[in-house]
């Protein structure tokens, strides 16, 4: 008897969930741009940097997938997964100090966002030829490339490459090796759009998305101290420690001073403001599942 009741209850839940189901799957294509400490500062629809070098730079592209669950004709929860290729170059900036600085680069940014969407008109109803503006906002995560560096401390060398003992604590070289590593941060996406339902199951939309990120590293303008490593050549050892002479005493103190000076000179821009990624996109969605019963 208990098994029959359990089966009946589960079947009832299944019927309710099917009747309440109204899903949309879609794709979005568009263009993304960065607003940060390097490059242009207009918030949307920045031009590609140099189409003649598209084979090297690519284009500032956005591509994504989305899923919508419509609670009623106006309210929707949606999940976005996307890829942004963003570019930035001080040569394209309006500010003289940026053009004189001439920093540049590109970044590959992957995103996942969960958002609430509100349609001003009942575009999620069954009827076709419905048009509605909408607003949305939520939270999400970004995975991006961030700068890293290794400061290589080495002895001065003679013409044959043989390490020379330092004559004082400043008599050694420090060079920098740069690299990129993946990082994850949060972002706050929001925006506006316009949705047109031209068929019982199909709709097109256009939207502008603004993402306030919780990082200042998307344009490589900032490197964190934890991302700066040091290495020490061990051709000459300290008899007391058995390690590199450059890792002992005043040599090590000088290496730390050089590390701090490197970080200070390497970081540019306003470290009190974070970066934005903004996108203008066009999309197409397909609705499936039985229409919900929007009961009063």
Task: Annotate each PLM feature.
Residues 198-296:
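Predominantly the C-terminal beta-signal and adjacent terminal strand-loop region
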Residues 32-62, 66:
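Surface-exposed strand-loop-strand hairpins of Gram-negative outer-membrane beta-barrel proteins
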Residues 27-31, 65-69, 114-118, 137-141, ...:
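Residues on the lipid-exposed face of transmembrane beta-strands in outer-membrane beta-barrel proteins
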Residues 20-22, 73-74, 122-131, 149, ...:
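Short loop/turn motifs that connect adjacent beta-strands in outer-membrane beta-barrel proteins
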Residues 37-44, 89-96, 127-128, 146-154, ...:
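Outer-membrane beta-barrel translocator domains and adjoining extracellular loop/strand segments
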Residues 21, 57-61, 108-112, 131, ...:
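Residues that define the transmembrane beta-barrel architecture of outer-membrane proteins
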